[in-house]
Amino acid sequence: MANEEHLNDQMVVRREKMQALRDQGVAPFGHRFDPDHDLSTDIRKKYENDSGELLLAQHNVVTIAGRMIGKRGSGKASFADLLDRGGKIQFYVRQDMVGEEAYKLFKESDLGDFWGITGDVIKTRMGELTVRAEKITFLSKALRPLPDKYHGLQDPELVYRQRYLDLITNRESFERFQTRTKIIKAVRRYMDDNGFLEVETPILENIASGAEARPFVTHHNALNIDMYMRIATELRLKRLIVGGMERVYELGRIFRNEGMDPYHNPEFDTMETYAAYFDFNDVMKETEGIFKAAAGVVADDLKITYQGTELDFSTSFKRLHMVDAIKEATGIDFWQEMTVEEARKLADDNGIKYESWWKVGHIINAFFEEKVQDTLEQPIFIYGHPVEVSPLAKINEEDSRFTDRFELYILGKEYANAFSELNDPIDQRKRFEAQAQENAEGNDEAQPIDEDFVEALEYGMPPTGGLGVGIDRMVMLMTDAKSIRDVLLFPTMRPKK
């Protein structure tokens, strides 16, 4: 609550009004109220097409509740706007209908206050659907004034810090978060309909594994051990495949102690899925289905627009090997066998920076990221990643330098990552050991050896296809949001000084 010494004039007046309510026997912060219409949209859907004459004749009485965000009129009659989670609806208050005492209470109330309204549905001469109040109930006092209704919150920092004010003043933002929930429901429905079981795995882990990322570290006092916030759910979910669950998915929060930009937040939602007897081609089909389900929430024809570019999810997504993509863009042919020295020379000649510990596969991946990725517009599967950057993916049978892995790219950004999963425990141990060596050579994001996971693989894991989808990025895409912060209700922020 605001320090009494720092109250502005409006806040002082509102506190005086709060006390006046108490003096009149009116609770400034009420208890339960029972509207018979949950949403203003219910009223609009039911009565919008009725004529004013018909509505007057029917005398349809409703009870609604919400925040007053506008008030107009003088004398003994006023109009006001009520905001609930369905949107805005107008109500009309007359002293001779609600009584002098109630009308005085209404006139003295402020924008931001909550009211319950009972009355009949009418249309004004301008044709606006309106609830004509027969009874009004004061529900809750707002002690701070709302932002200007015409301009809302202008400071992006305040939008993210005070999301509640953004939701009140920016209907587009409010509806974006409603759409987010609908998209997640549609994705879950698709997974459930295709025989996947939703599961939950630990957020606190003894070892940070499943991705190349820097973890958050915490301490468990009772066990007196350091633990890690999970950076992926992969290895837990694959243990469940070993256990016979066959098709599983988890949609939940991941934590990575890394940088922040319009596409990255330290905590974010992903969905990982694993299906026994799938290979990465099957997972491509699954991925298409997931994105079509999401696009269907916002566009019946599965064609959406993101930042001015139309994207078509109605057709099959293009598929292209990473090496072929590089060759198309640069003319360089990485299908040819080469030494790391030869690869480094190609990198030097083309302005590609590299680390001292990089192998040929790392340089191939860097060429793709630097020369190809930003050119990819429509949904496309890039497959065949080098072994060096895919420690958990199955080696391709035809060329052991590459893996049966793909990523989905749209408008130059990665939206999904998938493999034919590595199920050979001996190969898996070798790759973990190679990652440990990279860590020793300076790659602080390389994965440690997860002995328990290797042991699980030794009991046998069937051929499996796995997928990871960034849910926040997907929602950004489908709702035309510029930043990941626009689809997270409470994004990570530096504390206010």
Swiss-Prot record:
The keyword Lipoprotein does not apply. Mg(2+) 2 binds at E414. Its EC number is 6.1.1.6. Mg(2+) 1 binds at E407, E414. Pfam families: tRNA-synt_2, tRNA_anti-codon. GO terms for biological process: lysyl-tRNA aminoacylation. It is found in: Cytoplasm. It catalyses: tRNA(Lys) + L-lysine + ATP = L-lysyl-tRNA(Lys) + AMP + diphosphate. One of its GO terms (cellular component) is cytosol. One of its GO terms (molecular function) is lysine-tRNA ligase activity. Binds 3 Mg(2+) ions per subunit. Its cofactor is Mg(2+). Keywords: Aminoacyl-tRNA synthetase, ATP-binding, Cytoplasm, Ligase, Magnesium, Metal-binding, Nucleotide-binding, Protein biosynthesis. NCBIfam families: lysS_bact, PRK00484.1. Belongs to the class-II aminoacyl-tRNA synthetase family. Homodimer. This is Lysine--tRNA ligase. It comes from Limosilactobacillus fermentum (strain NBRC 3956 / LMG 18251). The lineage of its organism: Bacteria, Bacillati, Bacillota, Bacilli, Lactobacillales. The gene is lysS.
